[in-house]
């Protein structure tokens, strides 16, 4: 009793590990351990090991099965099935499905994934499957699903009509194409992402095309502005030239009127001579002018008739002169010819020609519309 009590106290204080607890019990499994070893050696002597389990490194223990103290019954089936042969046994043969694996395969591979990888190429398409690392477990790898042309065609048809599948339709397609529901769901997810990338690329290309197209209207607008500037510049030069011509004609007309007025006011005795000389000069000047200048002069004459030159008293009376256009050009010329040569004799004639009427005729000759004059 004292020995057992001290042993319990020491067990509680020391807190031994599980192995020490197992060794504290009396050895019961010596006969079982020897029998399990004998059975394992006998099983390897037959030389009919299961090839699949021997080729997986994770199922092959490094040495004899370790049994601490007494062997447990749960470890015996694993020792029987996966215990290695003797040291001089030949290595297991390599199968074709082993060569398809990558050389950098890790030693830890669960039996479920191994069995799925073994059955995967047989139940899927004729294409060589490719392995991709599984994100869930670092060491385990799963095979990439390779779809046949028929499966891809049917899936593409369904995706054309429906981007998203309800669960009953997904189950129906999976049963029709001999696929799992998860494979159909993953394929549709990937296809939606691909469709999204394609649409984004098209939008970017369209945006770049619009940006390039927007540059051309800017250039066209700049060209239009340049053309407008050139047109306005040319129009300004032409209008300036026309204004200069009109101003020159207006100055000539005003000068002739000023000379006539000065002759009438300053030299009362010689008034018949000076207006006639100025009139003859104007007539000679008009005969040598071009049609463009004649039009300009006619325009300026009309402006004078409208009262542009408000300084001279004759211009104020010009609107009333338009009523006297009934005189023909021949009569006016005959009148001027009749007055100019026989000017001294006209003083003694019974017809009384006053200075005002003579000045009126000279003003009429200088301001008449040139379109009615035929020289």
UniProtKB/Swiss-Prot annotation:
Compositional bias segments (type: Polar residues): 31-46, 266-277
The name under which this protein is listed is Homeobox protein Hox-A2
Skewed-composition ranges (Low complexity): 76-86, 106-124, 255-265
- What's this protein's function? Sequence-specific transcription factor which is part of a developmental regulatory system that provides cells with specific positional identities on the anterior-posterior axis.
Could you tell me one molecular function GO term of this UniProt entry?
Answer: RNA polymerase II cis-regulatory region sequence-specific DNA binding
Gene Ontology cellular component terms for the protein in this record: nucleus
- Which GO biological process annotations does it have? regulation of transcription by RNA polymerase II
The ranges the UniProt entry gives for DNA binding are: 140-199
Q: Which domain of life is it from?
A: Eukaryota
Q: Where is this motif: Antp-type hexapeptide?
A: 94-99
For this chain, the family text in UniProt reads:
Belongs to the Antp homeobox family. Proboscipedia subfamily.
Task: Please give the InterPro entries that the UniProt record associates with this protein.
Answer: HD (IPR001356), HD_metazoa (IPR020479), Homeobox_Antennapedia_CS (IPR001827), Homeobox_CS (IPR017970), Homeodomain-like_sf (IPR009057)
Q: Keywords on this record?
A: Developmental protein, DNA-binding, Homeobox, Nucleus, Transcription, Transcription regulation
List where Basic and acidic residues composition bias occurs: 209-220
Q: Where is this region: Disordered?
A: 29-142, 193-223, 255-277
Q: Do you know which SMART domains this protein is assigned to?
A: HOX
